[in-house]
């Protein structure tokens, strides 16, 4: 039986696709999972046993550069012996600097490397190892910064969604709650803007339109502060910290205001939840903007840059959307058409074929 190691770490945007890939492969191949300490907090170790290889970000802090460099070399040694001990046949990397030691060692040990790029901009580590990879799993042929000479390495699939999502109940495209239920997702990083600005938007909206809020908040203290504000003026609310199983909240959501991580926005499209994307402006290579722009160009969402966000303008837009629902329902129908071919079995068969044919 072929052995696959899936390497991940860092933010939820790297980890969630990794555990989905693990679920796709575990029945047909001997499958292993590695992460760094940051990524480990997003993983249920009981369901997804993983080995921790902690990789420091060498370029982040010049003061502790020598120490980080030493840790980096330690992670290379650890990666080398792990790959050799497990006799891995394929390394599947979800990108990020935490993948560097394993990819380097896989190259040395002549282990086949498969990369995964869910974003519309080629990540830096993926770009570095593209030359040495067998294939790169993507959702589109039109990825920015992708070298033309390696276009033949792209392996296209429909967007990766967790298996539980396919079994979840999806509402009709013509349904809407009274009052409307809005989901606010700040992501696993850069959520402070959502805690402050979007909560002010919610309070302003409530002055003109009754609504119900489900909101991801960055920490417990802010949950208490926001909950108090919402309760004082009578806004029905459900506030929570980052949640790997956020899909359990999707079933009766009418609208979302969200960051533009690839996993999150593809899940919203699959559930036919119209959304306003506000990309995280500090995301590497501005990839969140291009993730959202790709869907915006297909008439699947609305898009505004964080530096262009004005509470009064966004409030006016949302109120008009609630009054004239034609555009709202049009988005839902477009989402339904876009997602109808995305099935677990279709993606699963393609991913298995990828391993068997390489």
Language model features with spans:
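Conserved donor-nucleotide binding/catalytic region of nucleotide-linked donor-dependent transferases
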Residues: 302, 307-339, 357-358
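Donor-nucleotide binding loops and adjacent catalytic segments primarily
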Residues: 23, 34, 40-48, 166-170, ...
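C-terminal alpha-helical cap of glycosyltransferases
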Residues: 340-358
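Conserved nucleotide-sugar phosphate-binding/catalytic loop shared by glycosyltransferases and other
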Residues: 6-9, 27-71, 186, 305-307
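An amphipathic, basic-hydrophobic alpha-helix
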Residues: 61-90, 108
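Active-site-proximal region of nucleotide-activated glycan assembly enzymes
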Residues: 3, 30, 38, 109-170
